[in-house]
Every structure is written in structure tokens, then in C-alpha cells.
């Protein structure tokens, strides 16, 4: 059913207002950032001689380089670890006969319900006892552990939806669990793995 002209105009106007509402704060910040240091424009005013060096000064004063490096290192280590562990774990929960599988999975579900604030103090004492305070491992290990419960649940639901015919055909051809996982399950699960990687990246970077 085609929309009427009035509906299209109203929808376009609402979208335009939404875009304007989202863009204006960024324009205001950019306008203020390009002014001479110590001055503040009234509203959104772009000077004829923008001071682009303000960004360099702010970068150096805030010492952004080591902070950015730390974030990159965390992401490079945490995201692959979470994706690998959760892919293997999700496959095991969905396809393999593991003793006490249901109980272990419930524990992962419980891990999703625990507020992070309740873990800060125990994590501090645990990291301190391991002698890892003021090291990158003090961030990497908790971030991996905190992202695994969600990743396990996410990947398990993905592998449970895999076509059983393909798995049975691979088994008839003599493929073991590892080959079935690597050659059949993993390629089919790439969309879910990509989504998990993006979500883990955002959680780690933030």
C-alpha cells in the first residue's frame, strides 16, 4: 500500500528534525573547539581563522596517546579470546554430551544477572593477591571473564539452530566433532561470531 503524500512529507520532516537535533550539539562543540583559546562563541559561530591546533594541544595535554594504546591492546587481546572461548563453549553446550551440562549452563546464566558493582571489591582483592595491580592483565582477565557468560549464551543459541542434516551427514562421512565444528559449524556461525566480536569490542573499548 502506497503512503499518501502528507504521510511522506510528515515522515521526512520528522527525520530532518531528528537529524538536526543530533547534529547541532556536534556543530556547537566544533565551533567552540575552533575558537581562540579562552574564548567562547555565542551560539554556533565559525571563525574565519579556525584554530585547528587546539585539537593537537588538547591531545597532548590530556596525554591521549598512551590511553589510546592501552585501549587498543585491551581490544586486541580481549576480543579474540572471548570469541574463541565462547565459540568453543557454545558449540559444546549445543552439540556435545557434556556431564552436568545443564547445571554449568545455569551458572553462566546466573553470571549474567550479577551486577558489575558487586564484583569490583572481590576483583580488587583477587587481582591484588595475584600481584597484578597496576598491570594490563588486571584489566584483561576480568574483561574476558565478564564477557564470557553473555558470549556463551549467544553462541549456544546460534549453534542450536544449525541444520541437523549437515551435522549427521558430516558424521556419516567420518568427520569428528572438531572437523565438524571447523568445516561446517564455524562458517555457518560467522554472522553470530561477527556480532559477538562487535559487542565485545564496544564493551571493552568503553
Question: Predicted regions span which residues?
Answer:
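A structural signal for multi-pass alpha-helical bundles of membrane permease subunits
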Residues: 2-206
Amino acid at each position: 500500500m502506497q503512503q499518501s503524500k502528507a504521510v511522506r512529507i510528515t515522515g521526512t520532516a520528522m527525520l530532518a528534525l531528528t537529524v538536526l537535533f543530533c547534529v547541532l550539539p556536534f556543530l556547537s562543540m566544533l565551533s567552540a573547539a575552533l575558537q581562540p583559546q579562552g574564548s567562547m562563541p555565542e551560539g554556533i559561530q565559525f571563525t574565519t581563522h579556525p584554530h585547528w591546533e587546539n585539537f593537537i594541544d588538547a591531545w597532548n595535554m590530556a596525554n591521549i596517546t598512551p590511553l589510546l594504546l592501552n585501549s587498543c591492546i585491551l581490544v586486541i587481546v580481549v576480543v579474540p579470546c572471548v570469541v574463541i572461548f565462547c565459540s568453543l563453549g557454545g558449540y559444546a553446550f549445543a552439540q556435545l554430551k557434556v556431564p552436568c551440562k545443564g547445571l554449568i549452563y545455569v551458572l553462566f546464566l546466573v553470571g549474567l544477572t550479577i551486577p558489575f558493582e558487586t564484583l569490583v571489591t572481590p576483583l580488587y582483592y583477587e587481582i591484588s593477591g595475584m600481584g597484578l595491580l597496576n598491570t594490563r592483565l588486571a584489566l584483561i582477565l576480568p574483561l574476558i571473564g565478564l564477557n564470557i557468560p553473555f558470549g556463551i549464551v549467544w553462541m549456544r543459541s546460534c549453534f542450536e539452530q544449525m541444520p541437523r542434516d549437515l551435522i549427521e551427514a558430516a558424521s556419516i562421512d567420518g568427520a569428528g566433532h572438531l572437523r565438524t565444528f571447523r568445516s561446517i559449524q564455524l562458517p555457518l556461525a560467522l554472522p553470530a561470531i561477527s556480532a559477538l566480536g562487535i559487542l565485545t569490542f564496544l564493551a571493552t573499548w568503553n
